[in-house]
Amino acid sequence: MKDNFDRALAEILRHEGGYINDPHDPGGETNMGISKRSYPLEDIKNMTRERAAAIYRRDFWNAIRGDELPAGVDLAAFDAAVNSGPSRAAKWLQRAVAVKADGVVGPNTLAAVQKADPARTINRMLDDRLAWLHGLPTWERYRIGWSRRIGEVRAVGLDMVEAAQVPVEPVAAWWASAPPGAVEWLRRAPG
């Protein structure tokens, strides 16, 4: 969803943390989830939040077309793209909505996503993602963190779906259907 990048980024950064150089991490030196392996020309250790945000928007959010995905689905796809690559994230999204999994979020994928139940899409994507992570040789080392992350992304994503589906009654409609005397009472209320 167009207005969700900042919220989704905050969730990503909460999971990615700051600077680390874990010799067991295939990404090697990372900061805010941006790895030296993927960005060899970046000054990883001194990376700013603004620079990380620009990279995340350009290379991950835009790749999964986050602005065009429903609330919650955008977070699930974005987090998957950051953690496992945009192509793999796109394939999980595509399988969740039963379209050809070619790894590119295009018009067919977007049309299917718009027709699908967003909560079901999130759950299917994250179940598929967790199963894939379970098969990695690094699963035993990172399973607690990965499982926690997916559980938290699921919870936040489903909350975003619910919040987006709550109808907001226009004020004019409320005034028109207000109980007798309520409008006059509000007009006389102090303040």
Positions of PLM-derived features:
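Cell-wall polysaccharide-cleaving catalytic domain and substrate-binding groove, primarily
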Residues: 1-191
